[in-house]
Amino acid sequence: MSRNFELLQQAGLNLTATVEMPPTLERELGARVKKENGGSRAFAADLDRTAKEETLKLVQSVFLLQGTSTNHRAVVFAAIDSGSGCSRVCVHAAQMLAANVSGSVCLVDANFRTPSLPNAFGTTNHYGLADALRTEKPLRGFVKALDRNLWLVSCGSAGEASTNLLHSEQMKRRFGELRKEFDYVLIDAPPLNTYSEGFALGQLADGLVLVLEANATRRETATKVTERLNATEVKILGAVLNKRTFPIPDSLYRRL
């Protein structure tokens, strides 16, 4: 049994998907962000075939095969540690979901300390969630259209001092508005091992997708975070093993 899957098993997690981002592609995306002066549209087409398949599997498992009576789903994406690629997983899941459903999909950047979703789409970060939490203006005024059925609420005028807003009663009200306005809501949250916002947001959502970094996330840390999620009654809808690399050709690996 590999170290990665042993980690998942001992932490009591069921693997939903493994997402590989080839180093060459990651460098290309980074270069494109700089070239386009701070923005890059990280479309799902940027993923290789295997990553697309895994992202589709994640979307089907979490959003489309739950057997619920309604399509309204609100899910938090949160990594255990920083630097695990959670925002990228969340972005590609939203794009894949929007491409496979007729309903509306909304991405929400709730990572106030290190927001990244606007950069992924080459749009601005101003006038977003933090601003919406300070006013009673209609939520639609803080939403940016990205595609036919894909929308974004950036973090807005946020910062370290604004994180308490994510624990507020106004956040509960805004979350309710998001559910009414959109068929699917995907929230990118801060890492769970360092900050508490992901737990609070998970309690408002239908559940949480946990993102782990292959060969980096420690078993003890994963277990501690999982236990706290259970204690706070946050449902874990899936676990994603990100940044996994294949030392042998993928076509051969998948036959093993």
Tell where the protein language model's regions lie, with residue ranges.
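P-loop NTP-binding module
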Residues: 1-256
